[in-house]
Amino acid sequence: MASATAPAAAAPTLAPPLQQLRHLAEELRLLLPRVRVGEAQETTEEFNREMFWRRLNEAAVTVSREATTLTTVFSQLPLPSPQETQKFCEQVHAAIKAFIAVYYLLPKDQGITLRKLVRGATLDIVDGMAQLMEVLSITPTQSPENNDLISYNSVWVACQQMPQIPRDNKAAALLMLTKNVDFVKDAHEEMERAVEECDPYSGLLNDTDENNSDNHNDEDDVLGFPSNQDLYWSEDDQELIIPCLALVRASKACLKKIRILVAENGKKDQVAQLDDIVDISDEISPSVDDLALSIYPPMCHLTVRINSAKLVSVLKKALMSAFKMELECLLD
């Protein structure tokens, strides 16, 4: 006769510790797309800036602490039991989700530029923790290579940088403008160096002309290797490069001028205006890159002129936006 008492359900079997870490890494990576497109949490409460940043910093400290704890227990033998590993993984997952939840508390009206910076920091922390899980799941746990990866893991760097994030949209805008100035400065210096050396591909190709016969050079052309006209500027090319350099130099000066206008006249409550200035200024660096790349041989003069006109248009929009903000400040 069958027993009237049903057998107790068997406890679910936990995966091995390293497999649990790999699974957690996958779960964390699934959070990344949601953070990229996630909107700010709707609330009727007035935004408290000091409380938000305090909570965000505290959440970052918690994430860093959980990362350190997990690294300590998985960098030595014996490994934790499956039950202990489950607990560690749950704590890490909870710390990451708590950090993301705090990020969602930053409303849009505090500035799109500021939200982008905080979102970027959030993505760095989540991705850094996922990387850490993947590294810890590699065996043997005490290999020198593994320890090097762990010691330089980005999750701690991202958490430590949290207090350096700008606290308002004006500070965020100034940071982004400074980065754009640096990008354009680097592009200008690279262009100037190539022009001064009259060798746009200096260091990229070995000069072995003395070892190649005429027949060998003909063979290279057939095989698709660049000929001299593909590697060096013609006289017409060099004449066109001069105004291009001047335009990139003007772009750098323009960004510096905009940064000064924002620093001296921008107000923290001019959120939309600051966002507009940053959005337009963000177009300058890619436009400079397009122009810089188009001057390398073999040069298409039409492409260079199109990219130059595009950059001029972007510069005009950026300056108009900055001067508009300055005018509003003067009229207030």
UniProtKB/Swiss-Prot annotation:
Question: Region Interaction with RPLP0: start and end of each range?
Answer: 2-190, 240-332
Annotated positions of the N-acetylalanine modification? 2
Residue numbers spanned by region Required for interaction with CCND1: 2-208
Presence of the UniProt keyword tRNA-binding in the record: no
Query: Known InterPro entries for this protein?
Result: GCIP-like, GCIP-like_N, GCIP_C
PTM annotation: Phosphorylated.
In this chain, the stretch annotated as Interaction with TCF3 covers 2-184, 150-332
Subcellular location per the Swiss-Prot or TrEMBL entry: Cytoplasm; Nucleus
Keyword Acetylation part of the UniProt annotation: yes
Coarse class of the primary localization is cytoplasm
User: Which cellular components does GO assign to this protein?
Assistant: cytoplasm; nucleus
Which UniProt keywords are given for this protein, alphabetically ordered? Acetylation, Cell cycle, Cytoplasm, Nucleus, Phosphoprotein
**Tell me, how does this one assemble?**
Interacts with CCND1 and GRAP2. May also interact with COPS5, RPLP0, SIRT6, SYF2 and TCF3.
* Protein role: May negatively regulate cell cycle progression. May act at least in part via inhibition of the cyclin-D1/CDK4 complex, thereby preventing phosphorylation of RB1 and blocking E2F-dependent transcription.
The UniProt entry's sequence similarity note says: Belongs to the CCNDBP1 family.
User: What protein am I looking at?
Assistant: Cyclin-D1-binding protein 1
The organism of origin for this protein = Macaca fascicularis
Its gene is CCNDBP1
